[in-house]
Swiss-Prot record:
The keyword Transcription does not apply. The lineage of its organism: Eukaryota, Viridiplantae, Streptophyta, Embryophyta, Tracheophyta. It comes from Lotus japonicus (Lotus corniculatus var. japonicus). The chain crosses the membrane at residues 13-33. Keywords: Glycosyltransferase, Golgi apparatus, Membrane, Signal-anchor, Transferase, Transmembrane, Transmembrane helix. One of its GO terms (cellular component) is Golgi membrane. GO terms for molecular function: hydroxyproline O-arabinosyltransferase activity. Glycosyltransferase involved in the O-arabinosylation of several proteins including extensins and small signaling peptides. Catalyzes the transfer of the initial L-arabinose to the hydroxyl group of Hyp residues. Probably involved in the arabinosylation of CLAVATA3/ESR-related (CLE) signaling peptides that move from root to shoot, to interact with receptor kinase signaling that regulates nodulation. Involved in long distance nodulation signaling events. This is Hydroxyproline O-arabinosyltransferase PLENTY.
Amino acid sequence: MIVRKNMGRAKSLLMLLMVLGFFFATYNLVSMIMDHRAGNWVADGLESFDRKMLGSASTNAKYHVALTATDAAYSQWQCRIMYYWYKKVKDMPGSNMGKFTRILHSGRTDQLMDEIPTFVVDPLPEGLDRGYIVLNRPWAFVQWLEKADIEEEYILMAEPDHIFVNPLPNLASRTQPAGYPFFYIKPAENEKIIRKFYPKDKGPVTDVDPIGNSPVIIQKSLIEEIAPTWVNVSLRMKDDPETDKAFGWVLEMYAYAVASALHGVKHILRKDFMLQPPWDRHVGKTFIIHYTYGCDYNLKGELTYGKIGEWRFDKRSYLMGPPPKNLSLPPPGVPESVVRLVKMVNEATANIPEWDSLNRS
């Protein structure tokens, strides 16, 4: 499925964001945005948060699963596995999943349009991401939220390298979205930098949660307000050399955390939201496997992280095309989480049509 409309509106909105982002470069841009009430898409901190979060929604409300992606083979094969497991767990007891959308920010259709529900949006103007493609994520969400018809009251912001390992309920409450605490997102330890974007008059630096935008379950009305601020903060962070150097590949995650704080939003921190092999060894009642790290082991089942193992599974080994079917299982002694990951990848690749031939870069 493809939905694409009113791109002119989206481009106009981007121009507005860029003007705000660069015209006020010598001032605190975010403060200016928060005071700019004429634009309905950015609200006024805690007042907006209270207004939106005191609605009638209950925590068993359905949420829409949304992930951003490109048309590169590396992104495509991960999306196919993710969508396979979404369909497997969607209607299981305990799940509050609604519909699914792959937000494709390549600006054009690809060969998965008929397989995965997809909404095509524009990428940032050429060169604006400075090679950091993840900057397209907040802008993709802004466009999708503005133009798509979304039935659910809540949204799960997910990523292609997520696998649903257990049915996922709506973890958000009536007053707070739910997020996952990342050990490497440390606002307090980076207070000097955070204060460039979250000044002292806004509150303590502990207002900034140790999260990224994914996984997060959040009310649609709330992310509609946060997303444009997220775009602005991301661009400002990337434009600041000190911030860019300090935050590196997690810059966009910090930007979401700061944008949320600017809107007075605190997240429920759920460690059981997600596990990340090989560091998290057991699946238990966790809901999502995030296979962002390489898993390298010797044949004794000992982790050799940082050194290519005699047995390995690393998504980056498959940049140009999908992994083969029936990957070898890890040797004895490897943690359950890694074994479960490989088995789930194998099940998906065995059942997805045209796995070996569809998406090659």
